């Protein structure tokens, strides 16, 4: 349907669990075959190295580095820090040799970023910026489930039958931090793009952002 209506589709893959490996391989193979039959390229966003390796084996994908692999320090309390903050503006993707490694080994030359209320220096390439929410950290297993069942968010285990606690409950934090905990993540709000969208959009675009993703 998207192809008929001339929409470009991007598929975002979660962290690959071992029990989901064969299912993921089958899905990637099916998508690759479809792309070959229709002479299309499909953008795949990967969030772990296992999925990146599987996607790199196929020739009809444009592989993009997801936000869970594009690691950097993100915390609403950073604005209270004093001293030199220059190193917060860069991460590993600003190193050319690392981008070369990603391109040669996984075919990755597209990168997903998050707006988190702090200046960033973007590298060359296809950069996408997610806004206005960002993840400060993400656990492999659900911290909310661990708190509700075990009384300790650190006592995490793999959930096979989700009771959907997150529909009714969340971790709350002081209002000035503009953050909350839900699912296996902590989410925070960076409202700068909403306050002056035209000006902020032009500023980000001038510094290497090619696409904005409303989340």
Task: Give short role names for the model-derived ranges.
Residues 1, 7-215:
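Active-site pocket-lining/capping segments in soluble small-molecule metabolic enzymes
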């Amino acid at each position: 349907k998207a192809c008929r209506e001339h929409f470009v589709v991007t598929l975002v893959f979660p962290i690959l669990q071992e029990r989901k490996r064969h299912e993921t391989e089958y899905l990637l193979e099916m998508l690759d075959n479809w792309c070959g039959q229709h002479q299309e390229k499909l953008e795949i966003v990967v969030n772990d190295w296992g999925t990146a390796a599987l996607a790199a084996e196929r020739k009809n994908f444009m592989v993009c580095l997801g936000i869970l692999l594009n690691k950097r320090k993100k915390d609403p309390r950073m604005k209270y820090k004093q001293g030199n903050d220059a190193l917060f503006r860069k991460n590993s993707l600003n190193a050319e040799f690392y981008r070369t490694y990603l391109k040669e080994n996984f075919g990755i030359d597209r990168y997903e970023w998050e707006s988190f209320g702090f200046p960033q220096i973007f590298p060359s390439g296809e950069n996408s910026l997610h806004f206005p929410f960002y993840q400060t950290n993400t656990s492999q297993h659900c911290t909310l489930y661990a708190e509700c069942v075990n009384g300790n968010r650190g006592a995490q285990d793999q959930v096979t039958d989700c009771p959907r606690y997150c529909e009714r409950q969340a971790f709350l934090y002081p209002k000035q931090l503009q953050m909350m905990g839900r699912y296996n993540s902590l989410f925070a709000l960076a409202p700068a793009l909403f306050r002056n969208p035209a000006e902020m959009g032009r500023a980000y675009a001038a510094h290497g952002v090619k696409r904005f993703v409303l989340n």
